[in-house]
Amino acid sequence: KAGQMILTTGPYLEVETSDGILAGGLARANHSIDLRVRVQCPSWIEIDRIQVLVNGRPSEALNYTRETHPSWFGDGVVKFERSLSVELEEDAHLIVVAYGSESDLRLGYGSSDQSSNRPCAYNNPIFVDLNGDGFTPNGDTLGFALPSGRISVKEAKELLSEAGVETSE
């Protein structure tokens, strides 16, 4: 109920603010907030990217790869452990993504359908209130027209198809 969740295909992701606010929580900040990020993986899973999404959007300044920041990534169980500073101009929700763009899950998943998936984990948002008046969403729909009212599964699939998102039948 508190929204303190991660979604993962294997990597174990921990994200919290320097004040200990976890996913689903509300943090207060001035113009920046520090996120403590830790990713652990078994030996057969590799990650090579940490991306912070601000209000659902990626930023090149918050994209950390093994190639651009090699000393930030480990080869043992702990693949990444770092405090990341995020500069903000407005209230925001923050999601951290850990991803293995050069890896798959074949070693652990064998020949199952899931074996070709990439290692990926992300947290539920941490909401950040900058001015102390409560969190205000910015209203960005990320380019998707959001329907109002109830729609059927068929209508939802049609909307996703129009947006270029592939759906299963």
Map each language-model feature to its residues:
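C-terminal functional module detector
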Residues: 1-169
